[in-house]
Amino acid sequence: MTVHPLYATNDQQPAYALRYSWTGWVTRGDVLATTGDAWTNLKCAWESDGLRLLDHLVRNNEVHLTFSTIPSVSPTFIAARAKGRLKYAQRIAGAPVTFSRKVSIRSVGDNTADAVEGYIRAQVRNEGFIDSHFSEFLEQFTVMSPRVDLRRPTETNSGRYWYNLHLVLVTDGRHRLVDDAGLTTIRDSSFRIAAKKEYAIRAIAVMPDHVHIALRGNLEHSPEQIALAFQNNLAHMLKRGAVWQHSYYVGTFGVYDMRAIRMAGSKKCSAETR
């Protein structure tokens, strides 16, 4: 018998803040050192891919692009579209360039990895539960994984990727799960889901009516796919029906935040190791 998922792309109303910096290295030619029209056309093309160009900077042989994206866009898709459309625009302009095979993609946000991890770690304390015994009980469902370092990149043949996501799921109707079995299932099953999908959970806080997860994603999977994987699999393992709202929050974060990227426009960019 076919098991149909409880959650799908077309029934979601997500909230998201997804931003990435892309760096490519030119080995031959000059990148769009001509008119601003070329960048305007590129922005329109990238928009059709679900990538909004927030900023661009060309320094020596380095090209730095900052995008915001929709949840259906994965890091590997960004890598392909960023370089592919840039090379095509150069060729059309009569100034073809050659890029290094390797690129760098970093997830960035308004908060750093330290801030996100600290926020998740403090969930129980920040809720201010009146019942101290219940607070102590909940602490066991907040887990920090010391073996997972979100500051380290995923190395591939095509470059280096930092793909860090903060995912939040909320129970339907803010229904509170307070039983040991249910909370344990969410905590332990989240790690099993991550292992199967090739994600790496750095921090998780299972609360009565929501769950926070900070993780490194599979580069081939979009934030949307990752959210749906947790929604569907956790609901299946809980055996309580559609326990989650048909929505989620997902945001990117990294070693440094958007403020550092904004400052890069007025300062010399630090070289990234290829």
Place the predicted regions along the sequence by residue.
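Charge-rich, low-complexity N-terminal segments
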Residues: 1-274
